[in-house]
């Protein structure tokens, strides 16, 4: 696994490398007042809103690009979709866009008693491609190589991750998540990233790898998965 990268608020400027936070890191916790769910718990999965890098068609990966105004609007739509649900625990990654989106969602959920960070849900690392626009890469190299690095399952870009690598860490997260949900009998919300959502949906919706690679995750969509307690 390549090391995680944290960037300054200025778009795309790297400041340091960190060890990945693989595993649940509790960010906030308060006394639980929410009753345990019965029979089935819900996992609510959604993508962060549009970022400046998304808007400009840049490879984002682990760069800490923040939400645009449209991105906040996307997050507010997700928040409204989940407004009437009961959410006990919420997950985000270390990336600002994930935190900003979750913050909008949780405005309607005073019942949430725990917020957890887990970077196994990080976006796919695009390595040396990060910060380049898609068009810049195609002009410098070729459309064929673009397709290989952008949508190949098992070929990573230079210094980055393949989707196979992303899938491995996401499946590790899902394994721990299912144990957590069954133990605590609670609904959870997850503010994730486009590429980490693909293997997540593959697991619950039973897609093969080829189908998974074609999945599109809209900025304002919410996916609900039921877990038997």
Give residue spans per PLM region:
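Phosphate-coordination/substrate-recognition cap region in phosphate-metabolizing enzymes
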Residues: 33, 37-41, 76-146, 204-217, ...
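Non-catalytic terminal regions with compositionally biased, polar/charged low complexity
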Residues: 7, 15-18, 22-39, 91
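Short, well-ordered beta-to-alpha junction loops that form the rim of enzyme active sites
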Residues: 49, 93-95, 120, 151, ...
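Loop-to-helix element that buttresses phosphate recognition and phosphoryl-transfer chemistry
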Residues: 44, 50-101, 105-108, 157-171
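Beta-strand elements within well-structured catalytic alpha/beta cores of enzymes
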Residues: 42-47, 91, 186-192
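Active-site-adjacent alpha-helix immediately C-terminal to a catalytic or transition-state-stabilizing loop
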Residues: 33-36, 52, 99, 171-229
């Amino acid at each position: 696994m390549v090391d995680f990268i944290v960037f300054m608020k200025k778009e795309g400027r790297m400041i340091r490398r960190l060890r990945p936070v693989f595993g649940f890191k509790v960010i906030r916790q308060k006394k639980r007042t929410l009753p345990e769910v019965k029979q089935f718990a819900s996992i609510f999965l959604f993508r962060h809103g549009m970022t400046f890098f998304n808007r400009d068609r840049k490879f984002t990966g682990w760069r800490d690009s923040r939400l645009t105004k449209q991105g906040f609007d996307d997050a507010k739509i997700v928040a409204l979709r989940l407004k009437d649900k009961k959410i006990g625990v919420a997950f985000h990654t270390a990336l600002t866009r994930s935190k900003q989106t979750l913050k909008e969602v949780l405005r309607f959920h005073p019942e949430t008693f725990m917020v957890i960070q887990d970077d196994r849900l990080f976006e796919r690392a695009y390595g040396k491609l990060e910060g380049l626009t898609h068009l810049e890469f195609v002009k410098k190299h070729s459309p064929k190589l673009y397709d290989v690095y952008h949508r190949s399952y098992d070929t990573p870009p230079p210094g980055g991750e393949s989707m196979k690598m992303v899938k491995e860490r996401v499946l590790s997260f899902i394994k721990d998540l299912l144990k957590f949900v069954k133990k605590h009998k609670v609904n959870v919300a997850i503010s994730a990233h486009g590429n980490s959502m693909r293997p997540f949906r593959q697991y619950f919706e039973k897609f093969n790898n080829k189908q998974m690679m074609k999945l599109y995750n809209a900025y304002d969509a919410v996916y609900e998965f039921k877990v038997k307690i």
